[in-house]
Amino acid sequence: YFGTAFYGFNASVQITASHNPAEYNGMKVSRENALPVGYDTGLGQIKEWIESGRECPVAQKRGEVRQIDVRKDYLPFLLKYKGDWSGLKIAMDVSNGMASLFVRDIFGDTPSWY
């Protein structure tokens, strides 16, 4: 969601993993400013289109593929919310989540923080 809003994309699709079997994996769809796309704001129309069997029109203009390292912009965004946590004991399990990419950058190397 961050990248969609920060870079001004018109829409985004995230492929989501699941702890359930593979057939339950899915997609998170958002539009400009990372606003969610739900059943009433577009997903219902997509469902109807697919179920109708109509062909999808071909875009008049080809898109482009860009590789962007979102981390360089996302970390400063996260750090804006870091307060004075001295006196707090924080337990965190980032397991296989994306937060694991930023834990050391935010909390440092002090083992008591993990």
Labelled PLM ranges:
Residues 25-114:
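Gly/Ser/Thr-enriched, mixed-charge loops and adjacent short helices
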Residues 1-33:
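Ferredoxin-reductase
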